[in-house]
From Swiss-Prot:
The keyword Transport does not apply. The lineage of its organism: Eukaryota, Fungi, Dikarya, Ascomycota, Taphrinomycotina. One of its GO terms (cellular component) is nucleus. It comes from Schizosaccharomyces pombe (strain 972 / ATCC 24843) (Fission yeast). The gene is mug168. The keyword Nucleus applies. This is Meiotically up-regulated gene 168 protein. GO terms for biological process: meiotic cell cycle. Its main location: nucleus. Disulfide bonds: none annotated. Residues 99-109 have a biased composition (Polar residues). Has a role in meiosis. It is found in: Nucleus.
Length: 115
């Protein structure tokens, strides 16, 4: 309750969820282990928009509850804070034991093929 007697929850205005630009109605059954060619797991077809498409929110809700999802969402930080994987000698012989990020690794490999 606010000081003026109104409830903050009553004054919230929700924004509509954007519609994904592709149709998900023909994506295979999740029990079959089928994934879309876009690399995104099967969407929850029980929560479509009136146009037969899933919204970002329904995809997010589905991916956070299913163990079959390929993408895990870090609710606290989001994907913007993801760190490049570290490559070591075990993955590429001759680089030494010094860890390096993906860009360094790519440059090291590419430099072998430059003329």
């Amino acid at each position: 309750m606010r000081m003026d007697g109104s409830d903050f929850e009553d004054r919230k205005v929700s924004k509509p969820s954007p519609v994904l630009p592709f149709d998900v109605s023909n994506i295979g059954d999740l029990s079959q282990g089928v994934h879309s060619p876009l690399g995104i797991s099967h969407f929850d077809s029980k929560n479509p928009t009136p146009f037969g498409r899933s919204t970002k929110n329904s995809v997010y809700e589905y991916e956070t509850v299913t163990p079959y999802s390929r993408f895990k969402v870090d609710k606290k930080f989001g994907s913007a804070t993801s760190v490049s994987p570290v490559h070591t000698k075990a993955e590429e012989p001759g680089l030494g034991l010094t860890p390096m990020n993906s860009a360094d690794f790519s440059n090291k490999i590419a430099s072998r093929y430059r003329s």
